[in-house]
Amino acid sequence: NGITKHIIKKVYKKKYKIQKIDGLPQKQVTPPKEVYERIKSDNKLIGKARAVETDLTFFSNKFKPPLKNAIITGVYGSQRILNGIPKSPHYGLDFAAKEGTKIKAMLDGVVTLAENDLYYTGGTIIFDHGHGVSTLYMHLKDVLVEEGQKIKQGDLIGTVGSTGRSTGAHLDIRLNWFNIKLDPMSVLDK
């Protein structure tokens, strides 16, 4: 209608949780030098899978939770302190679940990465939902999809595991817009 509005909103600093995990094997806190090249290669695969830009518009639909009745044990933005060493914030949402629990696709998408054994994330799936929006599912025991496969919301895509850098069976999900990390909780249909 030709009307322009200017709205000023105050931005508040958010306090994030601090998660301290002690008693981890040293290789889970600081990887040995001999795996640096592997980690670099894994990061390239993940970066390439998240950089996909398509005209799909699946992201405009409601995201459904990937697990039924799961307990959230890790939240976006929380500071991780492993064996007393501060690490990067956690950019995902962790769901505790029994190993082998079925994981469902949160949204329609196209698989851009399906790997069974990445160093940090273990069994990993990345979906393209259009215009740079992607979701990641990590630490899977079983990856049941293939790159290029089209998936519908609610389809079985894998099972919960404790692969990669993990202290127990759980599912870690991530939401990205290209390389920008977003809080998955902000889009999950409750």
Task: Describe each model-derived feature in a short phrase.
Residues 1-76:
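Non-catalytic extracellular/periplasmic "stalk"
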Residues 65-190:
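Catalytic cores of peptidoglycan-degrading enzymes
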